[in-house]
Amino acid sequence: MKIINIGVLAHVDAGKTTLTESLLYNSGAITELGSVDKGTTRTDNTLLERQRGITIQTGITSFQWENTKVNIIDTPGHMDFLAEVYRSLSVLDGAILLISAKDGVQAQTRILFHALRKMGIPTIFFINKIDQNGIDLSTVYQDIKEKLSAEIVIKQKVELYPNVCVTNFTESEQWDTVIEGNDDLLEKYMSGKSLEALELEQEESIRFQNCSLFPLYHGSAKSNIGIDNLIEVITNKFYSSTHRGPSELCGNVFKIEYTKKRQRLAYIRLYSGVLHLRDSVRVSEKEKIKVTEMYTSINGELCKIDRAYSGEIVILQNEFLKLNSVLGDTKLLPQRKKIENPHPLLQTTVEPSKPEQREMLLDALLEISDSDPLLRYYVDSTTHEIILSFLGKVQMEVISALLQEKYHVEIEITEPTVIYMERPLKNAEYTIHIEVPPNPFWASIGLSVSPLPLGSGMQYESSVSLGYLNQSFQNAVMEGIRYGCEQGLYGWNVTDCKICFKYGLYYSPVSTPADFRMLAPIVLEQVLKKAGTELLEPYLSFKIYAPQEYLSRAYNDAPKYCANIVDTQLKNNEVILSGEIPARCIQEYRSDLTFFTNGRSVCLTELKGYHVTTGEPVCQPRRPNSRIDKVRYMFNKIT
């Protein structure tokens, strides 16, 4: 059986959940359509997702049509859940991008299409709600060409009056875009030679698979118009990115989820081989796990299975699998474009509204952060505050609501601050000698530090001979330095510098690697005190798409948000602005942009790097370490 994995993506109220229900119903997977209002749909059925109108976590359902099984991966659509978006897109064989015939291309549609193009996912456009009053499809087509891609192939003829009717094109007009994109076909066409349907279909298929052509279909999920045809398109146009025939097992973990009973589930896309119940499987070329229970989606329901084939999405109950873990042979993973996860840029302090719920809050955060790598937290052991780092405002709002709905914990949140970094100001060296108070460790370490250009990261080298100090001691020094770099003089991560291990002394047999591991961060702190450090703040590159009338306001507002506009383009009645902005200003800039353009703008951002800050340094409390803090205090007292 052919197995394909698709995503249905859309802006709010475009009808994504209704379309998914219609696909399940028309294929016979379910016998009754679910209701969004009643929360009986197979996807987006939590109270939180219904209230916000957005998908928050990846969900899975499925249907079977003839000899093809289709897994539908329900994908989040908000920028604050970008890591979840890219993880779920990475397992797709194709996507349906839903566009409301009444609303046209919205800001969120463009963000989703940007992600699909970036990941190289073959995509079909589906114009939904064509049965609503006042629809002008020519305007929607133009909107798509201007804001998404001009390389579309309209596959159907639509009559809106007196009754809505959708029929597939049979004449040659649909092939214009295909012919224009191929020099050989265009030359044949211009010379009057006939073009075979087969060669046109092959060219369309090639360009569709490499994401340079986008077929466009129509319908109404609510009124069941065009759904049967869409099912045929899904099963015929999308190919599975799996290894056929006998091969080694290969699968990738793309989602971690906790059930209401606190069971930990790992979602895995299989790319090759067969996974059997009770198999012992190697994970990321290291330890092995035993498959004790295995589930998959069958006609919209999760069912226990005893084997799963290449292409399938399986769910294992397991305490040890992590996001992006690879089961089996890592070399068999598809070479899809790798997208780096965005870094959390903000942090805040959280506490339960009811102090007696502190342990419940910590348990909940442990589960949520296990599922979402963009949420991190730690407990300050001096102040006992819970420090949470995250990506954006909506993500924090959703986490707060999730804690209340699923875990029954209400929280208080302080005003978020940006996560800074530190860089040494100048070259410096420092050595702490063995048996010289207050050093209690059986180790001598000498370090030097040198600043590097912005964006260089932390570089480490050792000039101490392995012939004198063996690898286990050398590794311990490097581990201690990495730990020390997590907190500079102002409490932030240290970067953009070169640290050299220049001198080491040990006493045999009393010295151990632990002595060197404990002493290294203390020496590092002292050498940083000699060098001094400066604060770096995160900057984002941005690209704004807005109506042309916003151009003058954009330039006038830029200084208010410390934004620097470096490029301006005018295209299709839009202004496209590119530049950079401090991360601390982007939330307000994006909100004001949405307000002044009445929601007709899009702001895409990526981390550009870190720039030196001005003004008073921003400090954060150090995370204490009971094993070395007393020694740190003694050295700080004498230096």
Swiss-Prot record:
Per the record, the domain of life is: Bacteria
Q: Which GO terms describe its biological process?
A: response to antibiotic; ribosome disassembly; translation
Which positions does UniProt annotate for GTP binding? 10-17, 74-78, 128-131
* Coiled-coil intervals, chain numbering: none
Print the keywords alphabetically.
Antibiotic resistance, GTP-binding, Nucleotide-binding, Protein biosynthesis, Transposable element
Give start and end of each tr-type G domain: 1-242
UniProt xrefs under SUPFAM superfamilies: EF-G C-terminal domain-like, P-loop containing nucleoside triphosphate hydrolases, Ribosomal protein S5 domain 2-like, Translation proteins
Q: Does the keyword Nucleotide-binding apply?
A: yes
Q: Which InterPro entries match?
A: EF-G-like_DII, EFG_II, EFG_III/V, EFG_V-like, G_TR_CS, P-loop_NTPase, Ribosomal_Su5_D2-typ_SF, Ribsml_uS5_D2-typ_fold_subgr
Presence of the UniProt keyword Protein biosynthesis in the record: yes
Q: Which GO terms describe its molecular function?
A: GTP binding; GTPase activity
The UniProt entry's sequence similarity note says: Belongs to the TRAFAC class translation factor GTPase superfamily. Classic translation factor GTPase family. TetM/TetO subfamily.
Q: Which PANTHER family match?
A: RIBOSOME-RELEASING FACTOR 2, MITOCHONDRIAL, TRANSLATION ELONGATION FACTOR G-RELATED
Q: What's its job? A: Abolishes the inhibitory effect of tetracyclin on protein synthesis by a non-covalent modification of the ribosomes.
Matching NCBIfam families, A to Z? small_GTP, tet_protect, tet_protect_M, tet_protect_M_W
UniProt name for this protein = Tetracycline resistance protein TetM from transposon Tn916
Q: What is the lineage of its organism?
A: Bacteria, Bacillati, Bacillota, Bacilli, Lactobacillales
